[in-house]
């Protein structure tokens, strides 16, 4: 079974997905990690600013690097790079690369391959997961929250000195980009269950989804 969890940045997708994977014994996959790894590849291996913005060169570069799913995370060329992709530098560029159609297709193909090769139960989270990547998922959830709440959440997650107002502006810009993408735009799809997480605890959100899961099993 696949439980697909969609929604904007800092709406609770990762926290809820990780908690659900523990509660239900499902494997966890974040598409956002893949986009962040691709952003890291672009930053590490491109030689000039032109190449950073050249989609076809980036596609070739991605094919030269080995990205593997491993134990609810991803490895780049055999190395765990999670600490390198959850940074401000990655934050500011990931939306650019995730807007490239061919890069989105690479990520979507990779996600489908993982599920096909490793036949198991999955919690998969990310933007457009419910509408483009796994529209056939048994359970489709869209998590949302006010921009103020999402800003505070992101602020509390970080260990740098970025101001609240800067974070809020960055989130609003990210929302605008995600909602207007040519391919895989952020939206509430057909048959997707909407949950506003603004004033709900992590356990409350998980309980709502687990109730839906139990109903779908019958």
Curated annotation (Swiss-Prot):
GO BP term, example: pyrimidine nucleotide metabolic process
Catalyzed reaction equations: CMP + ATP = CDP + ADP; dCMP + ATP = dCDP + ADP
Gene Ontology cellular component list: cytoplasm
Localization terms from the record: Cytoplasm
Entry-linked InterPro entries: Cytidylate_kin, Cytidylate_kinase_dom, P-loop_NTPase
Enzyme class: transferase
Keywords: ATP-binding, Cytoplasm, Kinase, Nucleotide-binding, Transferase
EC number: 2.7.4.25
One Pfam family from the record: Cytidylate_kin
GO terms, molecular function: ATP binding; CMP kinase activity; dCMP kinase activity
Coiled coil start-end: none
Binding-site positions, ATP: 7-15
Recorded family membership: Belongs to the cytidylate kinase family. Type 1 subfamily.
NCBIfam families cross-referenced by the UniProt entry: cmk
Name of the protein in its database record: Cytidylate kinase
Upper lineage: Bacteria, Pseudomonadati, Spirochaetota, Spirochaetia, Spirochaetales
């Amino acid at each position: 079974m696949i439980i697909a969890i969609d929604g904007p940045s800092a709406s609770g997708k990762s926290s809820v997905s990780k908690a659900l994977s523990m509660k239900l014994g499902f494997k966890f996959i974040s598409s956002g990690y893949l986009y962040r790894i691709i952003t890291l590849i672009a930053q590490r291996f491109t030689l000039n600013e032109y190449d950073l913005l050249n989609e076809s060169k980036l596609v070739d570069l991605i094919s030269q690097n080995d990205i593997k799913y491993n134990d609810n995370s991803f490895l780049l060329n055999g190395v765990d790079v999670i600490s390198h992709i959850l940074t401000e530098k990655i934050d500011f560029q990931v939306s650019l690369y995730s807007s490239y159609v061919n890069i989105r297709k690479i990520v979507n193909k990779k996600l489908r391959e993982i599920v096909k090769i490793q036949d198991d139960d999955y919690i998969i989270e990310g933007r457009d997961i419910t509408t483009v990547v796994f529209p056939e998922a048994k359970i489709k959830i869209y998590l949302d929250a006010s921009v103020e709440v999402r800003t505070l959440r992101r602020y509390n997650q970080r260990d740098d000195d970025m101001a609240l107002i800067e974070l809020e502006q960055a989130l609003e810009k990210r929302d605008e980009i995600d909602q207007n993408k040519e391919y895989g735009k952020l939206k509430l799809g057909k048959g997707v269950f909407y949950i506003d997480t603004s004033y709900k605890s992590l356990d409350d959100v998980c309980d709502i989804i687990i109730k839906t899961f139990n109903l779908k099993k019958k």
